[in-house]
């Protein structure tokens, strides 16, 4: 088993049309590199997993429990499990790195 991975060449999973992720996981955490195309929204949703992340490219609007912010590279967020949230990009695409705990089994592929 290797302890190192590269994002390039890793299989993608479509979240919604125009948004996809590449994931890596251990026993208790899952790392998700999310890419969202311009003019695309990951609609309001919830999951039982705690989610922490950081925007690494572009800008995206994120709403968490009714609080809405425009996030830029370097902006971070923490979303408790069960809290409704969404993300959307305007005229430019965006990329974020998310961490989930516990591991989201549906993201293991």
Predicted regions and their residues:
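A short, N-terminal "cap"/entry segment at the start of jelly-roll beta-barrel domains
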Residues: 1-28, 109
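Structural motif
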Residues: 30, 59-61, 68, 84, ...
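Conserved short histidine dyad/triad with adjacent acidic residue
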Residues: 32-46
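Conserved GNAT-family N-acetyltransferase fold
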Residues: 34, 53, 77
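Histidine-centered metal-chelating micro-motifs
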Residues: 41-42, 61, 77, 81-86
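Glycine- and acidic-residue-biased ligand/ion/polar-headgroup-sensing regions
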Residues: 49-60, 65
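Short acidic-glycine-tyrosine-enriched beta hairpin
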Residues: 67-81
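Ligand-binding loop in jelly-roll beta-barrel domains
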Residues: 81-106
